[in-house]
């Protein structure tokens, strides 16, 4: 993405959800040996609103596994890394599954809320606010049922013999 005089739209902030854990390990591969699921290379860039790459941005990812479960005590399918000089990052993971999550309202009533397949992401860069967002998979029939879903946060998916590649450019203000 070349630097431009036109301002790009900042990536939309979304809920962190209840499953973020601080202190994730710095690593590219967030899977474990023998983990079930379709391989996914999640890669992309972090840029400013002019399209200029942001080097040394901290990008933290966490997600459900291929059965729709989160590791809430450890760091399976969790990790962070720093972007390179061109603002690029890559994480090796698996395609997550949709799931139903409990949501408790102010009156203490709990109901189940559908979540389509997604990846959670936090991006932190010098002199900028932390971006917390989620990215989604195009064509998932459950996307429209998810309250957080939006076309503005869709991964660009390429299918390869080894699995999927999901790409996204995060734009920070």
Residue ranges and their predicted role:
Residues 2-173:
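Beta-strand-dominated extracellular/periplasmic modules and repeats
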